[in-house]
Structures are given as C-alpha cells and as structure tokens.
Amino acid sequence: MGTALVYHEDMTATRLLWDDPECEIERPERLTAALDRLRQRGLEQRCLRLSAREASEEELGLVHSPEYVSLVRETQVLGKEELQALSGQFDAIYFHPSTFHCARLAAGAGLQLVDAVLTGAVQNGLALVRPPGHHGQRAAANGFCVFNNVAIAAAHAKQKHGLHRILVVDWDVHHGQGIQYLFEDDPSVLYFSWHRYEHGRFWPFLRESDADAVGRGQGLGFTVNLPWNQVGMGNADYVAAFLHLLLPLAFEFDPELVLVSAGFDSAIGDPEGQMQATPECFAHLTQLLQVLAGGRVCAVLEGGYHLESLAESVCMTVQTLLGDPAPPLSGPMAPCQSALESIQSARAAQAPHWKSLQQQDVTAVPMSPSSHSPEGRPPPLLPGGPVCKAAASAPSSLLDQPCLCPAPSVRTAVALTTPDITLVLPPDVIQQEASALREETEAWARPHESLAREEALTALGKLLYLLDGMLDGQVNSGIAATPASAAAATLDVAVRRGLSHGAQRLLCVALGQLDRPPDLAHDGRSLWLNIRGKEAAALSMFHVSTPLPVMTGGFLSCILGLVLPLAYGFQPDLVLVALGPGHGLQGPHAALLAAMLRGLAGGRVLALLEENSTPQLAGILARVLNGEAPPSLGPSSVASPEDVQALMYLRGQLEPQWKMLQCHPHLVA
C-alpha cells in the first residue's frame, strides 16, 4: 500500500532568537538535512508525499488544556523580550512568533499520518516535524516540545478510529515523560521508552524515569521504562532490549497500531545521547516493529542533533518502511553489562503484569556501584568525565561511509516445480522458470539417491538457479519447492552450494524431518537450528535442536528468546529456512518466522518448501519476504511448561558462547 512522508516547509520557520546554549541545537537544519538526504537517496520519490496540515485547537485539546493552548497561541504577537521571558518559565524551551503555527503543523502531520494508515491509504509512514513533542505535557512546554505530537496522534486514533490497543515506542535518548504522564493510567496505550538516565543524573532528572515506574491504576504495567545508566550503548544493546523486553510485551499486547517517537539523538555521534548505535540499527528496529499491528507503523520525528547521523538514521528508517531489507549491523553483537542490568531490572519490574515474562527468570539484579540521584536536582555529568569519553571517541568512519548496499533488481522470486494457477503473488514477485545447467545439476545431485528421480532433479535445477541469483546479488530473497522425499537432500545441496559460492556465514533454520548432514564441516561458517527436533539439545555451538513449541506463546518465546538472538549473534550473510516433511507450522507462524529472519543477511533469505506445503505457504511467504507484514497470530497464549523448560535449558547451555542470548548480567565475563 505504500509509505507516506508527511512534511511542510513552514516547520523550518521557528528558531532561537537569543543566545541559549541549551536550546541552540534545536534548529531548522534538522529538517532540511533529513529531507535533503531522503531526496539524494531517491527515497522521497518512492513515498506518498503529504503536506502537513495544522491540527485544530479541538484536536490539540485531546491532550492539552485550553489555557495552555491559548498561551501558546498568544506567542504569535509577542516581541523578542516577551518571548524570552515566557520561555524562561519552562525547562529547555524557546518560543518564536511562528512557534504556534509550526507546532500545530507538527501535531497535524502526526494526525494526517495516522489517518492515512488507518484508512488504508498507506501501510506506514514518517512525519518529519519540528518542534518535537514527547516532552510536552498537558499544560506545559518542555525540552524543545510544545504540543505532544505522538500523544495527540494516539488520542486521535482512539477517538476517531476506535482503536483499543496502541503501542508507543520512544527510542529517543531522552525520557518522553510527557507521553508517560498523559497515559500512565490508560491500559489502551502501552508506552515503551529507553533513555539515557545515569541513575537520575541526566535530564530530565526524574525519579519516574526509572524501571520501577510502570504506570498507575488501571494502567499498571502499561508504562515500560528502560533507563540506560551508561553512555556508549550500541547496536547489540538496542537489539537485545527489543528481543528480551519490548517484543515479548508487544506480542502479548497485540497492538492495532504502532506509533514511534523517532528520536535519533540515540544514534552515534549525537552530542545529547553519546551513544554508539549506527544508523543501520534503526532499520533493524523498524523492521522488528513492522511484524506488529499488521505493519501499521507511524514514525514521528523527535530529537536528533548531529545532522549527519540524523539524516542517515532517517534514511534507514524510511527505506525499511518502504520494504527494503535492513543492511547488516556492524560491531560485536554482545550487550554490555550495564545494558543487561537495565534490561533485567525492567523485566523484573514488568513481570507481575505480563504473562510472557512470568515464566522466565526475571529476578531483579543490583545495579553497578554508582552515585544514585539524591533528593532534588542532581549534578549533571561533566562532558570531560571518564564516563563520557568513550562515546565522545565514537568512530566517525561509521558515519563517513554509510552502508549503501545496491538493491538487487529482483526483490523476491518464486521457483516452483509445477505452475500453480491458484497462487496469488504480489505484482513485483517473479515466478522463475529457468534452471541451472543439466550437467551441473546432475553433479550436485549425484551423492544423493533421492535426487535421482526426474521430478527431484528438476526442482534442484530451479533451486540452484535461484540460489545463484541471490549469491550474485541479482535476487534478494526467494522461495523454492522440492518433493518431500528429496527435501533433506535438496537442503544439503543448498547449504553446500551456498558455502562454496560466496556465503561466508550461512544460517539454516530447519523445521521437520531435516537433520544436519553429519559430514558438514564444523568450521563455524554454518549455524544449524533444527526446530521440531526430538529433544532440546545444544549438540555444538553451531548445531542446536529444539522441539517445536505446541502453543503460540511458546513459539514466540522460541523465536524471540532463541532463534533471533542466535541469528543476530551469528550475523549470517545467507539464511535458509527449510520447511520439510512434518514441519507442523501454520501459515501465520511460518510468515512471522520468515519476516523476522528477513532482518538478517540484508534480507537474503531462501525458503525451501516441501511440495505438500507449497500451495498454502508459498503465497504468504512471498508476501512477507517481499516486505509485507505477516498476519497476526491472534490472542496471546502462554508457553507450555515443557516449552519453557526446553528454552531455559538451551539458553543455559549456549549463553556463554552466544552473548545475544543473555538478558541477565551475572553471565557477562
């Protein structure tokens, strides 16, 4: 359905009119730099461009008091000295004669985006706005924010569109206390915020930014705070937070809409955040969110003050919303001790309210020794202090050379053994008819008796041709079919062909009667995960087997708690998903697995289906590999005790080697 980009050039008008070192970083170039980069990359042209409208005062009143709206309206006629005096009554705020107009446009852009997504005009989108909004409170401007754009959008989605479950993900580096205050007693809005906290020593210096602030009244458990107590958090820390905290709760909540307070001051190079996450990380975060709410994701710009980092991160977010695969992540995939402490503390605080966490080890852990915030306003961290120096020395090369992988000419191809006239594919998914050379196909088939039959040989030839197209960069992802009797042999050939023709690290996720070939080299180049094995077993660091969970909750726990952490730790450049005889997966479960694995290997995922599964699975897998959202799994269910036991056993065996499995700090060396 497409991606919307909502913007209005008038939002560059508001600016600081006096000297204020605290506020000078919020400047018009934040918008123009991001928009210019989108145009340079050809991304704006691929979006449905919407010109932002002003929010009405009635719409602003969904979250703000009439008196506050009136106060901001009156700034249009104030002089410089009066504006400065009024600004001084708030924390980290400046007003300009155009602020009221710009802030109404910013709020209106979020409303337009929500309307476009919820009416089906587009699938998702980004609103490029300023001033930002997530610190804005019912009767107060705060932290560069005038009207709370995302909160207004959430209230509008409830009132106008009748939504009952809205997820707000705030990945800005500052705590969006404005959103928290507005919805802390509302169970229809699940608010997640990670933020630089430093045990209360970082702005906005609030006790209620800590992990144990979980909402109140009926909203208990619907506020999720993840406080970062050190600077320098990187890609592994952010992905671990999603896998071990946000996504388990989000799947249980089952949102109808995802709103993102998309602040990019949490990216590398930003002077406010001093974090290490590269722009590509936001592509992965976006893609992980797109498996929720039928892909209805609305991102609204918040912070971001390093123009290069901001522009790159915006581009990564938009190209992922457009359905492009996420580029590979850089750096070691091992969360740091401080991140694990914060994640586990948040899990422990949330466990009483969420079934998905109650079956796991979520005991609270003591924080690393530090000076916790005293009563009153604590002293800020000094920029030259030892805690800040690591982030200040962030490698600029990560921004100087952004990951610009050329897109394959074909996003998704399907190679079936026989044409299926009932198969409905997206218009840009091609049905491949070509095959590898007969002599080459026979050579690969020769060691396998099950590949001697003509039907199996034909299927193998089509698979080899498709796989070569993926390895050569002509095709991004694909689906191939094979006779059930030849499924194991065909998978064996696919693995060996991939490793011998360019893949350096191959991840194979095999379901059903598909055992790892005993003579496959144990050289660390392949990671084999067998789901539907006879028992949970870590046969080696690179060979893991687990039974297929019987409940949807167990399946989600397996994907989020085992498969994806292993996959992100391994960082493959080719993923094979094989559904063999007796695989036991229903269409929505297979689609979710493929959609979430698509975040790996630059989206280079090949799904191998045994023929009996092809009619019901080929279409749905083609859609998710092509960038569409998977269907909902329906109402959440808990994992069975047997599934929980298998998962905990495997995590215990594998955590020392695979750091992304960890969500408890005592395991860090």
UniProtKB/Swiss-Prot annotation:
<dbReference type="GO" id="GO:0019213">
    <property type="term" value="F:deacetylase activity"/>
</dbReference>
<dbReference type="GO" id="GO:0000118">
    <property type="term" value="C:histone deacetylase complex"/>
</dbReference>
<feature type="binding site">
    <location>
        <position position="20"/>
    </location>
    <ligand>
        <name>substrate</name>
    </ligand>
</feature>
<keyword id="KW-0862">Zinc</keyword>
<feature type="modified residue" description="Phosphoserine">
    <location>
        <position position="393"/>
    </location>
</feature>
<dbReference type="GO" id="GO:0005634">
    <property type="term" value="C:nucleus"/>
</dbReference>
<dbReference type="GO" id="GO:0006355">
    <property type="term" value="P:regulation of DNA-templated transcription"/>
</dbReference>
<dbReference type="GO" id="GO:0035825">
    <property type="term" value="P:homologous recombination"/>
</dbReference>
<keyword id="KW-0234">DNA repair</keyword>
<dbReference type="InterPro" id="IPR000286">
    <property type="entry name" value="His_deacetylse"/>
</dbReference>
<comment type="similarity">
    <text>Belongs to the histone deacetylase family. HD type 2 subfamily.</text>
</comment>
<feature type="binding site">
    <location>
        <position position="305"/>
    </location>
    <ligand>
        <name>substrate</name>
    </ligand>
</feature>
<feature type="region of interest" description="Disordered">
    <location>
        <begin position="361"/>
        <end position="387"/>
    </location>
</feature>
<feature type="region of interest" description="Histone deacetylase">
    <location>
        <begin position="1"/>
        <end position="323"/>
    </location>
</feature>
<feature type="binding site">
    <location>
        <position position="265"/>
    </location>
    <ligand>
        <name>Zn(2+)</name>
    </ligand>
</feature>
<dbReference type="GO" id="GO:0008270">
    <property type="term" value="F:zinc ion binding"/>
</dbReference>
<dbReference type="GO" id="GO:0040029">
    <property type="term" value="P:epigenetic regulation of gene expression"/>
</dbReference>
<dbReference type="InterPro" id="IPR050284">
    <property type="entry name" value="HDAC_PDAC"/>
</dbReference>
<keyword id="KW-0963">Cytoplasm</keyword>
<keyword id="KW-0227">DNA damage</keyword>
<dbReference type="InterPro" id="IPR023696">
    <property type="entry name" value="Ureohydrolase_dom_sf"/>
</dbReference>
<comment type="subunit">
    <text>Interacts with HDAC3. Interacts with HDAC2 and NCOR2/SMRT. Interacts with HSPA8/HSC70. Interacts with MSH2.</text>
</comment>
<feature type="binding site">
    <location>
        <position position="172"/>
    </location>
    <ligand>
        <name>Zn(2+)</name>
    </ligand>
</feature>
<feature type="site" description="Substrate specificity">
    <location>
        <position position="272"/>
    </location>
</feature>
<dbReference type="GO" id="GO:0006325">
    <property type="term" value="P:chromatin organization"/>
</dbReference>
<dbReference type="GO" id="GO:0106048">
    <property type="term" value="P:spermidine deacetylation"/>
</dbReference>
<keyword id="KW-0597">Phosphoprotein</keyword>
<dbReference type="GO" id="GO:0043231">
    <property type="term" value="C:intracellular membrane-bounded organelle"/>
</dbReference>
<feature type="binding site">
    <location>
        <position position="174"/>
    </location>
    <ligand>
        <name>Zn(2+)</name>
    </ligand>
</feature>
<feature type="short sequence motif" description="Substrate specificity">
    <location>
        <begin position="21"/>
        <end position="24"/>
    </location>
</feature>
<dbReference type="GO" id="GO:0019899">
    <property type="term" value="F:enzyme binding"/>
</dbReference>
<dbReference type="GO" id="GO:0047609">
    <property type="term" value="F:acetylputrescine deacetylase activity"/>
</dbReference>
<dbReference type="GO" id="GO:0045892">
    <property type="term" value="P:negative regulation of DNA-templated transcription"/>
</dbReference>
<dbReference type="GO" id="GO:0106047">
    <property type="term" value="P:polyamine deacetylation"/>
</dbReference>
<dbReference type="GO" id="GO:0047611">
    <property type="term" value="F:acetylspermidine deacetylase activity"/>
</dbReference>
<dbReference type="GO" id="GO:0032425">
    <property type="term" value="P:positive regulation of mismatch repair"/>
</dbReference>
<dbReference type="GO" id="GO:0033558">
    <property type="term" value="F:protein lysine deacetylase activity"/>
</dbReference>
<dbReference type="GO" id="GO:0042826">
    <property type="term" value="F:histone deacetylase binding"/>
</dbReference>
<keyword id="KW-0539">Nucleus</keyword>
<dbReference type="InterPro" id="IPR023801">
    <property type="entry name" value="His_deacetylse_dom"/>
</dbReference>
<dbReference type="GO" id="GO:0016236">
    <property type="term" value="P:macroautophagy"/>
</dbReference>
<keyword id="KW-0479">Metal-binding</keyword>
